[in-house]
Amino acid sequence: MTKKSFLKYLLIPTMTLVIAYPILSPLAQKSAEHQPAAHKVIAYYFHTNTRCSTCMKIEAYSKEAIEKGFPEEIKNGTLEMRVVNYERPENRHFMKDYKLVSKSLVLVNMVNGKQTDWTNLKLVWQLTGHKDAFLNYVRKEVRSYLAKG
């Protein structure tokens, strides 16, 4: 192998790396920015096609407890609130996943994108007539799940 051909093999990969780095670097940064949080809590409010006033109140109070109680956690992605109609075909698996028998607020603990445990906050039904107690109950349970991280 001549000195010239040796340099050709040595320089081409180096030049490719130098050229590709500025192009790939922002993509790598964006990819890292969109990685799921190592620990995350998802609060699901599950409802059906039929929505009574109590069910609507549970959803509204749940959103208020979470959105006003944990704005930083929502912003940084460690807490998320999802409202899901579990009667829709694509969501029916949730009935089995979380043993749903009625409208429910369920907290799910996620670690590295995998569910580790969950709990159904069953007291929300008894607390709908006591807004402050409802908000405190939900926030206490969410705090407990956030502390698992």
Q: Where do the model's predicted regions map?
A:
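Non-catalytic, surface beta->alpha helical segment in thiol-disulfide oxidoreductase systems
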Residues: 107-149
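Thiol-based oxidoreductase modules, predominantly thioredoxin-like and allied folds used
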Residues: 74-90
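Charged, often glycine-rich, active-site loop that binds/positions anionic groups
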Residues: 92-100
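N-terminal targeting signals for export/organelle localization
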Residues: 1-31
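Local sequence-structure signature of Cys/Sec-based thiol-disulfide redox active-site neighborhoods
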Residues: 37-68
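A short beta-strand-turn-helix
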Residues: 28-40
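Solvent-exposed, acidic/flexible segments
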Residues: 48-55, 59, 88, 127-135
